[in-house]
Amino acid sequence: SFIGGLSILLRGEFILILLISFLYLFFYFKITIKNISLMILIILITISPYLIRNIVVIDTITITKSLGYNLWKGNNPSSLVEGGVIIDANLKKEINNIPKDKFYGINFNKVFLDRATENIINDPIRYLTLFTKKFMSFLFIDIHSSRQDYYKPLHYLPALLLAITSLFGIILSDKKSNKLNYLILIYFVNIIIFSFFFILP
């Protein structure tokens, strides 16, 4: 639980992984509500200094202020599997109009969150297709990379070999093992999160 709290502070999306983990613990490992509540309490104690700091400084209960930007970075008109972060004139104007006060970080994030949400709603097919491409690229390799050194065998073959053997391992794994099934679940949840929010590094 302490590690979970630290992970939340490092990566905001880890909250989703923790929620899934608690549900899995409850339904498959039969962990009691009391024990899960205790784990949540330890997590809250771990992150409480940061939460208190945000309440005091910006009057807001928040863990991360980069959710909107990360979502936009992976879901904007110029975004590709490996990037393409171009801020258009209208978005630049919105950013420039944000008041330079203690709420700047929150409002900056909101501008990108609103724009990313608008992009996805207005063109769901494009972003679903992009999500699928990123998912396959994170799972295997990027077949449309523009980097000249990407397709050097020493670069892509280890990643491809690891991906293929991992999938074979998943297929052949003991489906009755709750521990293995949990690891497989978290493996795919991580890929889904990164495919939705981020671009291929």
Locations of regions flagged by a protein language model:
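Structural signal for the C-terminal ends of transmembrane alpha-helices
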Residues: 23-31, 170-176
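Membrane-proximal stem/loop segments at transmembrane-domain junctions that anchor or position
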Residues: 58-136
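Transmembrane alpha-helix segments characteristic
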Residues: 2-4, 38, 44-45, 158-167, ...
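Membrane-interfacial entry segments at the cytosolic side of transmembrane helices
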Residues: 29-41
